Each structure stands twice: as C-alpha cells, then as structure tokens.
Amino acid sequence: MGKKQKNKSEDSTKDDTDLGALAAEIEGAGAAKEQEPQKSKGKKKKEKKKQDFDENDILRELEELSLEAQGIRADRDAAAVKPTENNEEESASKQDKKKKGQKGKKTSFDENDSEELEDKDSKSKKTARPNSEAPLSGSEDADDSNKLSKKGKKAQKSTKKRDGSEEDEDNSKRSKERSRVNSSGESGGESDEFLQSRKGQKKNQKNKSVPTVDSGNEDDDSSFKIKTVAQKKAEKKEREKKKRDEEKAKLRKMKEKEELEKGKKEQSKQREPQKRPEEEVLTLRGTPDTGAASEEKGDTAAALEDDNEGDKKKKDKKKKKTEKDEKEKEKKKGPSKSTVKAIQEALAKLKEEEERQKREEEERIKRLEELEAKRKEEERLEQEKRERKKQKEKERKERLKKEGKLLTKSQREARARAEVTLRHLQAQGVEVPSKDSLPKKRPVYEDKKKKKTPQQLESKEVSETLEISAPVEAVDQGGPEKEETPPSVEPEEEEDTEDAGLDDWEAMASDEEREKEGNMIHIEVEENPEEEEEEEEEEEEEESEDEEEEGDSEGSDGDEEDCKLSDEKDSGKAGDTKPSKDASSDSEYDSDDDRTKEERAYDKAKRRIEKRRLEHGKNVNTEKLRAPIICVLGHVDTGKTKILDKLRHTHVQDGEAGGITQQIGATNVPLEAINEQTKMIKNFDRENVRIPGMLIIDTPGHESFSNLRNRGSSLCDIAILVVDIMHGLEPQTIESINILKSKKCPFIVALNKIDRLYDWKKSPDSDVAVTLKKQKKNTKDEFEERAKAIIVEFAQQGLNAALFYENKDPRTFVSLVPTSAHTGDGMGSLIYLLVELTQTMLSKRLAHCEELRAQVMEVKALPGMGTTIDVILINGRLKEGDTIIVPGVEGPIVTQIRGLLLPPPMKELRVKNQYEKHKEVEAAQGVKILGKDLEKTLAGLPLLVAYKDDEIPVLKDELIHELKQTLNAIKLEEKGVYVQASTLGSLEALLEFLKTSEVPYAGINIGPVHKKDVMKASVMLEHDPQYAVILAFDVRIERDAQEMADSLGVRIFSAEIIYHLFDAFTKYRQDYKKQKQEEFKHIAVFPCKMKILPQYIFNSRDPIVIGVTVEAGQVKQGTPMCVPSKNFVDIGIVTSIEINHKQVDVAKKGQEVCVKIEPIPGESPKMFGRHFEATDILVSKISRQSIDALKDWFRDEMQKSDWQLIVELKKVFEII
C-alpha cells in the first residue's frame, strides 16, 4: 500500500508540473471548434460521472476536509516563520482575482458556461494520471478540452501565471499531508486523489465568480456541493479573517521595530552601562511572540490527533480553533500590562542613570574650575613675589648708583686713566700722600666679619677722579669677602654696571661729594644703627649739592624732594635689602638697567613737574591780577571787528579782504586806553582798577570758521557776544552760545547797531543809558520792543537776559549792553562792565600765577621771518632761549625760542606791524614766537616749556595725548586736490568745506605756493586729472610756480576770501563735469524697460514707430534697445521721443510715449511682427563701460530705482 501511495503521489506531482504545457497544447488543438458541441459533450460526461459515483468517494471527501483543516494550520505556522513570502503571495493572488474578475465581466458568457469550462479543464488535467479507475474519462476529457479550448482561451491566459505559483504552494502542502496520512491508516491510501480534487476546489474558492469541481473520480456534482460548499465558505471566511488579523499583527510588529530602532540610535550615543536596561526592554517585548508560536505548535499537534474522529469532532475543533484564534489576536494586539510596566521601569532606570552621570560631570567640572582658580591664584602670588624681589633688587642697584658704588665700563676706563696720571705725577716729582697717611676705615668690619685683605686698604689718589674711584674699588673688593660668595660674582656685578651713564657720575663730582662718598662706602656693607646716622648726613650733603648744581630755585626744590623721597626709601629698606645674591639674579636684572634708568629719570622729572605745579598753585597772588582774555563772538557782519576798531581807534576791518575776518586776531588794550574809553562813566572807580589791561581776541563769524571760534572761546576768561539788534539771534550766534555753554564761559551781550534805530541821535561821550533817555519816544519804543524780542530769543535758548542798567543779579542774568560801533555809543559802558565783572567775579581766575599756560592760536609764514606761531600767553612768563614743546602734525616739536615779538599796544597781532622784540614776556599777552621747525605746528593746542632736558619726554607724552583728536581731523586721501593756506586755522576751514562738499584732498601746506607744491599737485594728472588743482587761500603764488603749473596742466585757484575760492573751485568742477558728460554721453546708457502698446504700432520697420509704456528706468535719445526674450536681438537706437505730439529728451517711469527706433548703421533693419512681438519687453542694452560712465559722470541724474534696474539688467545681460 505504502509503495502504491508513493507512486501515486509521484505521478500526481509529475502531472501538476506538466499542466502548463498540457494547457498550451489543448489551446492549440481546440482553437477551431464551436461552442455548442462543447456544451452537449459536457452534459454527456456529467451523466457518465454520476453513474460511477460511489460511497467511498464521500468518505474520501470527508477525510480530505479534515486534512485541509490541518493544512490551514500548517499554512499558519509557515506564515509565522515567513510572513513576508505569504504577504507577497497573497497580494499576487488578490491581484489575479481582480484581473480575472474584470476579464470575466468583459466576456459575454454566463456563470453556467464558465462552470462547464472549468470542469472540462480540470478533467483534461486528470488525463495524464495513470489512474486505474478512470482511464477512459481522461482521454475523453482531453478531447472535450480540445473542443473547449477556443472558448476558454482568454480565461486560461489570465489564470496561467497564477496556476504556476499555486501549484508550487500546493506541492509543499501535499508533501506535508502525505506524511500525515501515511501515519493515519487505510483511509490515507487514497489521499492523493483527494488532494488533487482539493487543489481544483481551492482554485474555485479563490475565483469567486467561477466555482469549479475538481474530483479525481466521477462524483455526483449536486450531492457533493450540498455537503462541502457551506463548509468551504465558512473556512474561507475564517481564513480571510485570520489573514486580516495576521496583517494587523505584522503592522504592529513593524511599528514596534521602528520604535525600538529609534530608541537604539538615541541610546547608542550614551555609555555602555546605559545599554543593559534597553536589552531588558527588548527581551520583555520579544516574549509574547514566542509564546504565541509555541501555542500554535501545540494546536497543530492536537489537531492531528483529532482528525480521524469525524464530522462532529471537526465542528468542535473549529469552535476551539476560533476561540484560540481570538486569544492569539488578543496577544498579538500588543504587549500586556506587565510588559508595559517593565518597559516603563527600565526607562525610569535609564533616566535616573542619565541624571546621575550628568550630576557627576557637573561636579567634576566644578572641581576642575576650583583647581584652575587655585592654580591661577598661586601663579599670581608667585608673580607678585618675583616682582617684589625684582623691585627690591632695582632699588638696591639704584641706590648703589646714586652712591656711586657701581662702575660702568667708561668709569673703569676713567679710573685707569687716573692711575696713569698718578704715575706721571709721581715721575714728575709731585708729592703724593701714601696709603699709610690716609685714615683707616671703621673697625666695624673686624667686629662682624673676617679681617680685611691688603687689597681693601689700597691708597686713595689725589685727583678728583681717583678720590671718587677709590671708595667704589673698596666696595667691589670688600663685597665678596663680606658676602662669602665665590669670586665669580665680582665680574658679573661689574657687567651690570657697564650700561649706566657717565653723566650721573660726573654730575656728582665736587668737593663735598668726595667727602660724602668716603662715608657712603659703609652704607651697603654695614647693617647697624650707625649706618642710619651716616645716611642722614649724606642726605643733607646731597641736598646742598643738588641746589648748587641746579642753579635756580625751582629745580632745587624738586631735587630736594626727590632726594628726600629716595633716601627715605633707602633708609627704610636698608635693613631688609642684603647684598647677597646669586649669579642668576644678576644676569636676570642685567638687562633692566637701561630701562630702569630711563624710567627713573622720567619719574623724577614727572614728580618735579607735579611738585612745581602744586607749589605754583599754592603761591597764587589774588592781589595782583593778570590781564583778562576777552573773546569776541557773533554772527557774520554783526560788527565784531568794528567794535574792536572803535576801542583801538584802528581801521583793521577796512583793510580786511572783503571786510571779512578770516583769522584769529589778538589786541593788547593797556590800562591807559581803558581809562580813556571809560571817562564818560561817572560811577567808575579808576583809581582801584587792579587789572593791568585787557587782551581781546577777535574771531571770524563765518560758518566755515567754527574751528577758530571754538579755539578762541576755549582760552578766554569772559566773552562778548555781538548781536545785531535789527536781526536778533542768528545761526552762528546760537552756535557761539552753545560753545560758551559747553566751555562754561561767562559772557555779556553787545546789542550792536543801535544807530540803525529810526531817529537815533548819537552821543558817544556819554553813558548809553543816558543817551537812551534822550532819544525820542518812537526811538525808545522801537528799542524796547526789539530788546524784549531778543530777551525772548535768549529765553528760548535757556538763558535769562536783561539790560545791564536793569540787571540786579549779573550771575543769573546775562547783561545786554546797547552799542554802536559806527557812532561809538555804548563802548565806554561795554568796557566798564567788562572791567567790573572781571575784577569782582573772576578775581580767583585772574590771580597771578607763575605756572606757564599758553595756547597756539595760529601758524603763519612771514617773509623774512620764516614760519612763526601766534601764542596767547595766559599764565606765567616766556623767556628768549626757553626750550618749548609745541604740537605738530607728525608729533610734538621740540625747539628753542629765537625771538619774542609783540605788536605795539592797541595794535592787532595778525596785522603786519613793526613788531617789538622782547627778552621776556609776562601774561596775559598775544605774542609771536620765532623758532626752528615750526612749519608743521598745529594750532589750537597748548604750548609747554621744559626747564630741564629730562622733562622733555614727560611733556611730549602730555601733548601726544591731546594731539590724537586733532590729527584725526586731518586725514589725507590718495587722490585729491592740493590745499594751501596762510594759516592753519583758515586751512582747517577750507578742509572742512571740502569735506562737506565730498572733495578729497591729497596734500596740505601753509605758506606761499612754490614749485615743489606744483610738483606734488601734478602727480594727480596720472591718477585723476580733475584733482590736479591747487587751492591757494590768501597766499602768494611764485612766478616760476605759476609757469610750471601752466606747462604741466595744473590749475591754481587763488583768492583772499574763502567764499570766492569755494565759488571758483565749484564752477571749475561743474565745467569739468559737463565736459566729461559730453565726452561720455554716447557711452553712457540709461537703464529702461518698455512694454509695447499693440494698438499703437505706427510703423513696423525702418524706422520702427511704436507706442510704449515705460515700466522702469528712463528712456533717453540715443538709447540702444534690444529684446532679451528673442535671443537679445538689437532692434535699433531711440532717436526721438514724443508725448502728446511734443518732442521730449527723456521719458520717465509710468509715462506712455511714442518712440522712433532707427536701425543700427551697418545692420539690416529689424521688423515688428517678425523679429519681435507686442508681448516682448524692450530693454536698453547696457554694458560694463556704460555703467562705469553713469557712476562717474551721470550719478546726479540717476535715482535709486534706476540703480535697482541696473542691478536687475546686469543679471539679464550677465555683466560682472
């Protein structure tokens, strides 16, 4: 039986594999047969099959159903092992079903026909089997199938591919079933036939629309369907349900896997200890699936045992199976509560671990920071310790130098020369005291230390140099014995001293010093109370010597203090500082000697200057006052210079170019002139006038000269603000008020031009208050009205103002003095008020002080004198031959005063006068200083005097600090004009104008224009010809310089009035610009974008005349146009633009204009409609050259939107 079954199974497998080939043959054979004979033959076959039907077939069918149930379970196991394969097969089978269903719908056959078709197909497949029961039916089936192949050709084609895959699947199932059936007994012998029939039935179930019967033996179809169809449907529903559940479970698993992968990625960044809880989570999540698999295996085993019990048991199994499936679904739905809890606990542990590690990391970083801070503190303390040690060593060396115990190389050479001289003297027979005749040293050495060597008791020479060098020799030789250090230290100490200067040594060479030095030997060597007494004696000797050396009281005071300070330090540290030190420390401080010497000299000079200033500040004499410095400020043409002319009885204003003040001037007004001018003031006490006179400074009022106004106001004690009564406060008046506010300078207001009041009657010989009372009513009313208006304007500026004769509180109210520079009214009252206010309110400020305070006002080049500086001497005195430090363009300038020139009394400093030469000048004066190297002096900064050479570096540093701000103002450009002026003040004003006009300047100079200036300016011809210009303000132009400028092509503009120079240069720039615009007008292309109006096409070709809308930019005549959308075709040049039949030169954005575009010469004319359409945008054809020309010469005609369009077109034309 077993062999027969095996043979049968082998045959069945062979038949299954040959089905595809057999179907193809059947299709080919039966292509030409008709449908009706097929139906009739099919009925005959069915009748034969019914006859052969027997009871054994029913039993086999039941067994097959039970095996099928087992096969489903096996399928489920296989699906658990390989879920992906089943998914693919199921999806493929579903697609096949859909395709089959669609094809079935298309065909015109009904269900009965399709059923017959399937039956015959299945029978044809059975023909190949060597089944003993139905050999005839197999051959008949083959014949029938040949007949039916034509009819079922399409259906077979659609199912062909699906059959192949299903056969593979069924083969695997049959092999499993065979193994089970062999063990089940006799009923298993006929399982092969049942399996073959079940294969057909499964295909029918998958094809819902075409149910087929595929039994091996001839069965009765009707009786067979009644038994199995309901069961098949139920099983099919269960299978579909299970498949859905399995798909859901797979989706859940996929999601869980993704979540786990994300978690793994996040946790892999952390340390290895953190990975263990994650593994636990993974194992916990893996448990439900394994349990489910084991249960399934148990189910299949149970099912095999119960298969043979029959139909009743089968139903019970189905119920059990459905309950188990539900349980499995519940398990597959997700992890249980315990699993979730375990996962949460694992995650909590993981989080705690992270927090713990974070805390540990923070603590570690904190510890490291504390250790670092501790280390830095130790380093700082160590550094301080080293610095203290170094400072002590410096002080010791400094003291030794002061005492003359350290010898430099030059000093040793001098010592050798002195020895040679001594031998010569002895050879000539001069008596020289022997070493025995000299007094012995103190016995202190013998008490404390070893006995002296003979070298320490060498004789002292007679000459001064020998007297000086002997004690130092004793120190150098005696030092090593006392310190008990190796002899190698001695040469190193000598090396330290090599860099010390000879001057310090020679400065101390005097008789008293020799005695002192003899005693000073013991300072460094001994450490006892006697040493301090000796030091005190030596300090007194040093003080007396310094006084003799300095020769003047100021220097001696400073040196006494220095000596006391330094020696007090020395005596205080004498016990602490010990001479013992190793060779390394010597070499360490060896290089510091030069620096410390310079620093020492610098600090000494600084202390001396500070002490001198402090003493001068204390010795202020309030009884003796200096002349107050009065500054005159105001708007243009208010009468500032005219007021001064009236005071001085001069005509400076008439001699000025254009009547404009362009320089700062200073006038000395002596006491006699004050008394003369104030004789009409009755209550003026002329006997008690304490000021020796007045120094009045006149400043320019024009806008350009704000720097000079600022400079003049910065050094004045009191100011006169001149206001035109007819015009009130004007721009420069308000600027002057703000300057005075910022400087906190007191001022009085001169209400000038009262003679302009209607019916004013002048009375210069009387007080202005009396003169006002004498005027007519209408004149007084007008004056009061205008005065009140000006008081209101002052109130708007935050100042209280009142007429001087009504002012009860001059500290809170500004005094207004009505004046007339033309008639002289009010001049006496003005001077009286100035004298009164300065004597009473400014007595402390005007107190006589020896401390020098001076300020450079102007730098001028005078013929026959060279470059001179006008200086306002505020305090102190200046002497001829003094070393002065003045600020310069390239740094402070150190020079000597060669001459002090003063203008005659009541004469203007800036006007060329017969200057008086003085040896000494006292404050306050306007003085002209002659000296060397004053060409690059900067005005507006202080002048300092150095009484000693070592003070020069200190004073230089003071000036450098103040220089920085002024130097930042004058910055030269690489390309620009050359500027030349008579004074620095007017040069600054000219540069300020150029800066506001955005004109660069490449060179500046003060003085006449020479050939060298033309040479410098001619350099610009190579860079930019428009800047090859010299602006000469109020200076003479040499003839040879003018000739050279003409030959080279350099323009020289010269004017005495700054505004005329401005106008001339501005006109030149405009002309030059027009010339260049004319030159570049064909190159410069203005950007534009035009849209064609299709209803206004007047001419389409040669020339093109069309109406357009300017969308952006501006269209000008001569603009070349192109069409970017048509491969940048050039259509021509705009030659004419019309608006409302009127021709215009330019059309701007938003305008609708008619343009005539003529073709480019030498090119074929372009045509509207062929080369471009109405939809195309026309743009101007720009290039890099045209853009540069616009930037350089047509910038004023371009707007911001035009530049934006250029940027847009650059991208279109790809211009870099």
Swiss-Prot record:
Stretches with biased composition (Basic and acidic residues):
7-17, 49-63, 171-180, 232-279, 322-333, 348-422, 433-448, 511-525, 563-584, 594-604
Q: Where in the cell is it found?
A: Cytoplasm
Q: Where does this protein chiefly localize?
A: cytoplasm
Q: What class of enzyme is it?
A: hydrolase
Q: What species is given as this protein's source?
A: Mus musculus
Positions of the catalytic residues: H702
- Provide the protein name: Eukaryotic translation initiation factor 5B
Q: What cellular component terms from Gene Ontology apply here?
A: cytoplasm; synapse
Q: Residues annotated as region G1? A: 634-641
Task of the protein: Plays a role in translation initiation. Ribosome-dependent GTPase that promotes the joining of the 60S ribosomal subunit to the pre-initiation complex to form the 80S initiation complex with the initiator methionine-tRNA in the P-site base paired to the start codon. Together with eIF1A (EIF1AX), actively orients the initiator methionine-tRNA in a conformation that allows 60S ribosomal subunit joining to form the 80S initiation complex. Is released after formation of the 80S initiation complex.
> Cofactor: bound how, per the entry note?
Binds 1 monovalent cation per monomer in the active site. Structural cofactor that stabilizes the GTP-bound 'on' state. May also act as a transition state stabilizer of the hydrolysis reaction.
